[in-house]
Structure formats: C-alpha cells, structure tokens
C-alpha cells in the first residue's frame, strides 16, 4: 500500500539519475565524429578541468560518453542505457544489482575511468586471479586506448611488480591480494618495500560474495611456531575411540563440539593425565580439534587430499584454496586424521577482515546479480545503498516449483532421470552441487544411464578445463555438473561460444611454437586451457613436471576447419615465429598476444593483425554451426538449471538460477531437495522430522506440500539471520581491533616515513621517566616519604649512563621539577649515547632507532593479537554473569592496548640505551637493517 502511495523507492532513486543518462545520449553524436586522437585527447582535457576546480560529477556526462564511444571502437561493445545507469550508481558509491549477462564487467569501465582522472588510483576488485586478468586485458583496452595506465596484480608477482601495478591509474586485483598487500605493507621495514598507495576508490565485482560470504573469514598473515606433532597424533587416536552422543555432543549449527563428563573421564584415562586443562601439559585444545576434524570437517566436502597435502575447498565457490590453512591447530588435526605429514602450526602476525579492509576506502561501489535480499546488511555495516538496475531485455526464465523427496537417494535418482530426459530433448542442463563428493555421486549415476556429461569441481584435473567446460555448457544436449557456480566468470551461451572456440584453436597452433620451453614446465602447473586469457589463478597443480600441449579436447570444436582457413592460421603463426623468434616468449606474454588478436582494439602491429585475420576466419566458420545450434536450443526451451540443495542463503540459490535465461533467452530452473539435506536437518528441526514420518511415500516419489515449502523458506531465513548475526558479531568485535590496528599502523607508518626519529625516541624516554616518577611518588604523602632511592634505581636500570644520579639531588624538588630535571638528564644521556654509537659508524644511531621501534611494534603487536584472541574466547562466558561480553571486550581490550603502547615505549628506550655495537658486527648488522 505504502509503495503505491509513495512510489517504489528504487524507481525514485533511478529517476533521479535519468537526466544524466539523457545528457550522455545527447552527447553521443558529437563524440562519435571525433578522430581516435581527439578522443584520446579528452583525457588530458578532463584532467585540466579537474585541476581548475571542476568536480568529478560535472565531468560525468561527457566522460561517460567518451568511455561509451571508446568501448564501441575498441571492443565493439556500446554501453546500453541501463549500463550507464549502473555506472552512475557505482560512481556515487552505491551497489548496483544487475542480472547475470547484463554486462557488469563493461559497466565498471565508466566509474573507474572517471575516478582515475584524479590520479589517485582506482582498484577494480574481482573474486579470482583469472577474472582480474581477463578484465584487465579485455576492459583494460578501453582505458589504455584513452591514455590511462592499467595495472594487474596476480598472486605470483614480486613486490617490485606489485608496486609498478598499484601505481597505475586503474589496477585490477582480487580481494585477497589487496588485503594481503595491505597487511604486508604494514609489516614492511622500509618505505621502499611498501607497494600500495593510499586507498581512493574501488569497484567490487560480485560485491555480495566478497562483503558478505567472505566477511566471516579474516585475512591472516602468519609465522611458524613449533608444536609437538605427537600430541596431534595421539589426540586423533583418542577422537577415533570416543563415541558421539556418549562421550561428546556435536553442535552442527555452531560448528562446535562439547565433551560430556564421561568423555572427559575417558579422554583423561586414555591419555593417562588427571586434567585435560592442566596449563603445564594442556591437552583439551588438541582433543577438541581432533573431534572437530572427525565430525565437522569431511573429506571431499570441506577439503581434498592432494599429493599428501590437505587442501581447503572454498564452501562458497567450490574451488580449492592452495596455500590457505585453517588456524588454531585445526589443519594439523585434520592432517593427523588423514595420516598425512603434520605441518608446523602458525602464529598470527597481522590480520584484518574484509569488512574493515573495504571500509578503509573513502568511496566504494559494487556490482552483483543478487544484493537486494541482503540490503539491510549492506546499509548497516557498510553504509551502502542498493539500487536495482532494470534488465536491457525482458526476462524469459521460468522458475519451477521445488521437488522434495523423502531420502537423499530418492532425490539423486530423480535428478539423474531429469538430466536424461533433458538430454533426450537436446536441452542443455547445468546441475549445481554443493560438494566434490556429491558431484561425483551424480556423475556415477549418469555414467550408469550412459549420459555423456562434464564434471567441474575442485579436483585439479577438472579445474584446468574450467572455462572450456562452462563455455560449452550451452551446447545442444550438454550436461554439466558444477560445484557452486557462484562467480564463475565465463558466460553460458546457448549453442556454444564461437569466439571462445576460435581463440582455443588459435592457441593450439600459436602457443607450442612461441612459448619458451623452460617457461611451460617450470611450474609443474598446467594452466587451464584457453580461459579467455588462459590464466586460472594457479588453481590446478599437476604432480611432477609435465610438458604442455595446449591441445583442447577435439569434441569442443563443432566442425573441421577448411583447408584455406587452416593454411591462413599456419601462415599467421609462421609470421609470428619469424618476428618473435622460435619458442622465445614467456607464457603470459604469449597469452597476451592471443588475447589482443582475439579482440577488436585498433592496433598497428602487423603480426597481430595477421593473427587477428586468421582468428576471425576461424570464428566465422564455427559461427555457422553455433548460430544454427543457438536457434535450435532456444526453440526447445533454452538452458535448464538444476539446484540439488538449498544453500545457506537464498542469494546463492538465485545466483545459480541466474545462469538460465540470460539476455532475454528462454530457460527454466528447478531445485531438487530431500528431507535429509543439511539445511533442513540442521535448521528445519523436529517439525520436518515429524512431517517425514507423516508422509508414507516411496523414496523416489516427490512430495509437494505448502507446509513443507514454508518450512523450507523458514529454515533458509533462519540460516540467513543466524549467519548475519555471526557476521555482525565478527564486525562488532573486529571494530575494536580495527581502531587499534589503525592506530598502530599509523604510528608504524610515521616511523617508516620519518627521516629523523630522534625526537620521537626522546619523547618515549621522557614519557618513560614520567611513568617511573608517577609510580614511585605518591603525591598524597609528604615529600620526605617519597621513595626516591627506588625511583633513582629504576631510572638507572633504563639509562645506565645516568649512573652518577643520586637521590639527594631530587630531595627539594616538586614532582613537576623532578620530571623536568629527568627530562633534561635523559636528553643529555641520549646525546652521549648517540656520540658513542656514531663513532662506530656515522649515522648508525638513526638506523638503530628505526630498527628498534619497528621491531618492538611488530613483536608486541603480535603478542597483543594473541592476547586479544584469548580475551575474546574468555569474555564469551561472562554473558552468564549478566555482563555484556562486547562491552567487557571493548574495555579490557582498550586496557591491553594501552599497556602495549607503554611497553613499546619502554622497550625501545631500554634497547637503545643498552645497544652496544661491535665495529665488525656492526657493518653486518647495519646491512641487515637497511
């Protein structure tokens, strides 16, 4: 009713920006007639106008018109009006919800160009290395054409490469790289090692997956700590012996385990100890982790074992996360359970959550296909509004009602039958599963039915062909099983993707002749074949060294090339070999050549032009087949998407559904569920179990019931609220850490940038003298009772150069005078110390100051992080004592922080006065410090 009276708030918001869109359209004709050079010249003109005091908002219509025209010339893509609208929403620092296939990637070029004109840098954030690389090459052409520099950060880059790329006008980077670089910069020992500039503006692609799904996981940089391996092994044996429900309870919802009294007794008995919590010989932590590893962390669901290593599988995207480890000894417990080699445990050196990382940007915008459901969270935590952008063409997707089965076996049987029916009809099918294990179960069922299909999950052999599989998922009769399709960057095009096939063909001929021999197998890594840029973020490792062939699976190509086209292709490659040299380019550079050849950007390199001609000819031949197939597939109903389990959030379900019916194509989606699914089991509660028994049906008969659908929706809402509360709590607790982190990092940066730290150290020394005076002098007592002897002793402990100081020198002074006197003494002593040290090597004192301050900040901050973790664990219990744990955490955390700051000061003063360089050692030490 309110909506009718007031109008839709979203429509009102979009209406506000409509005049800008009209203005951009009016400028189109005027910009179209400019030559390439004149169009490029616009960038310098905009920069001058900014320098003269115009605001970015004033430049917006003309700048967007320029980007639209550049996109048309370089990529052959012209921004639709709805894309311009999305670009405006991003520029004003909001989230634009745009449906899958509406060209989100192209939208990002608008605000990133406009905001890069300030020269302060723009970050375009994607979810993985491959997407960052694809966008930097593909969309980066627009920016390069307009004269802006484009940077790309990849996980394998060196610090100097990172520095160069962050200094560009626009940098494409993943969320984790930006976070880890931020943390590493705040551990750097000299400004030369700092790679990032101050944050300015960022556009986040798949913003919901980064700011919401990933918000619970902090980024952690850690160092190694030795822990007893045998304890993990013993604990694993004990966990194996203990029985669920008798010795311990499992709380699946909170992902935690609790020992019962019998469990404690049994574990203590098996270990031969009297108390699991004995501080001298603590066992509780090891036993709890071992039980968690047994009950809550399942092989092929939460992790896979590869080459003797336990590798985490990302629960949201189903990709493997090599190099990431669970903390707190959990990873070691899983290694013990799997009888793999136990790696040393780690200690946190620096940490930040994505929530706080992205709040460091003065302005940020984000894009996603699904954000409206989480709008309250975006507004509450990030102060980001969500605007829903209308689609360019009407949606023709149909979401069919859920099929619910009594058992899991019944459900999977029905899914396999549905795949078979669709395959018979010739409709492509995409099945989304939630784990590696389930995707392989379905694969086995389809094999029995003799249905050809592709499998895409975290296993290395499949990861390598990821884009190849996805790009062909729209072919007639194709059946594709994929673990969580969220955020997979390749579009599913009905009838198959001819551009992609042509690029693969070009790579097949080009790469083996051009890439350096040692470059292709030094990784022992096979790069995923033919991702639109051939880089997959180093996901798929292959055991042993393996020389690559770059040959794609022959069944991908719809037809054999004609003799003329094949000759054209071979000739183009021969010209390239003559120009670049036989097998002489690094792999990434060769990939770039293929990428540029496959695009439309204006270019004058004759070799690339020849390759482009060949590529276009190949594409035309394939297109005759794919266009025909596209029309056939559209005629029989388009892509059918099957969901096999409801996810923790409706948003991820919607992402899967969004794969069907892109850009006005037809399509259908349906979820198959069983009453044994995790979501219903953990959150549906007894009500569902009761329903179960009430339905006396066969296991392969679907149940349709309004009550059941409501239970389902209720369960999902419950999960969303539950996880939202967890994220909110993570955020509130991390907010406390965040203020401390900002303070300590600001102090650290001042030290790094500071040319002369002498004043700072003297301030530390004076403050330390004040602390000593305040500790030993009680101003409520008469001056004769002040403990001057102890005070002088303490001063000498810190500053041995004041050995001649006597208590009687202070007898007739007031507290203020004593402090002033000690300040003066400590300054004199410091000058003396400096003279001594600089005799060993001139300027050494300055190096020593920086070294000791950074060293103490880093060491004590590390210890502080551990104390804060311990505090957070312990305040949880105070809720029972009617105290608010968060308030307790804030006040005690603040006390701990102040203590740490005092200790940093005192340690630095003590270390510098005690510092005794030996001439020959010093030459070494200083070279280490610098």
UniProtKB/Swiss-Prot annotation:
EC number: 7.4.2.8
Cystine connections: none
Organism field: Nostoc punctiforme (strain ATCC 29133 / PCC 73102)
GO terms for MF: ATP binding; protein-exporting ATPase activity
Membrane topology listed for this record: Peripheral membrane protein
Function: Part of the Sec protein translocase complex. Interacts with the SecYEG preprotein conducting channel. Has a central role in coupling the hydrolysis of ATP to the transfer of proteins into and across the cell membrane, serving as an ATP-driven molecular motor driving the stepwise translocation of polypeptide chains across the membrane.
Primary location class: membrane
GO terms classed as biological process: intracellular protein transmembrane transport; protein import; protein targeting; protein transport by the Sec complex
Descriptive protein name: Protein translocase subunit SecA
Enzyme class: translocase
UniProt-listed Pfam families: P-loop_SecA, SecA_DEAD, SecA_PP_bind, SecA_SW
PANTHER family: CHLOROPLAST PROTEIN-TRANSPORTING ATPASE, SECA INNER MEMBRANE COMPONENT OF SEC PROTEIN SECRETION SYSTEM
